[in-house]
């Protein structure tokens, strides 16, 4: 496929399905990471305000899980496709780093990243994956004169996905739009599929379900 697409502008959107193949649990699964918590209790700005300790423990568990999972063949295949394609952008709805560990370089995380934490005062993000960053205590930033508490650098329900201007521009200009591990029927993925189709891109849906 890399040879066929080598002179095309290719954009790939990945969803939870591609990470599930590596053992990353998703809230859609019966045994998923979210099953003991309502989404409203752990993944909204309101939850952070009402019970920071619960939200922090929840995301620390997810951050620690990153140490236990590895990229799968799909991650490596996308990195190989990128290396053979002149213009390639990978947009992921996932918050893990499996694409990067699989070799992908041009990655946009629209829902944030588990590896980074965000200063509540400045909004700046820092990679914080040291042993002391993964325990039960809150983590303080390095960017303020008086260190501030950091929050998960995640787009919670009700918040706007990151880098949407860049994402929409890339999708508008692409020749081929590939959706992997997502149904493509739920927003914002559905909106990106519609955007690609309206600009005459060739759309390919690869869903693991």
What are these regions (language model features)?
Residues 1-209:
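Conserved catalytic core of sirtuin-type NAD+-dependent deacylases
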């Amino acid at each position: 496929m890399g040879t066929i697409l080598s002179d095309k502008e290719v954009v790939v959107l990945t969803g939870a399905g591609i990470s599930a193949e590596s053992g990353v649990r998703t809230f859609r699964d019966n045994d998923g990471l979210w099953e003991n918590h309502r989404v409203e209790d752990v993944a909204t700005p309101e939850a952070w305000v009402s019970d920071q300790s619960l939200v922090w423990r929840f995301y620390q568990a997810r951050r620690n899980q990153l140490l236990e999972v590895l990229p799968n063949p799909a991650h490596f295949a996308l990195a190989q496709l990128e290396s053979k394609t002149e213009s390639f952008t990978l947009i992921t709805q996932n918050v893990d780093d499996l694409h990067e560990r699989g070799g992908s370089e041009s990655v946009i995380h629209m829902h944030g990243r588990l590896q980074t934490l965000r200063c509540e005062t400045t909004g700046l993000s820092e990679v914080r994956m040291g042993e002391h960053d993964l325990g039960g205590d809150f983590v303080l930033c390095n960017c303020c004169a008086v260190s501030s508490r950091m929050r998960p650098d995640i787009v919670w329900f009700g918040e706007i996905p990151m880098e949407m201007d860049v994402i929409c521009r890339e999708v508008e200009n692409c020749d081929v739009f590939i959706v992997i591990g997502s149904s493509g029927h739920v927003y914002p993925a559905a909106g990106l599929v519609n955007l690609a189709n309206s600009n005459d891109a060739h759309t390919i849906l690869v869903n693991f379900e």
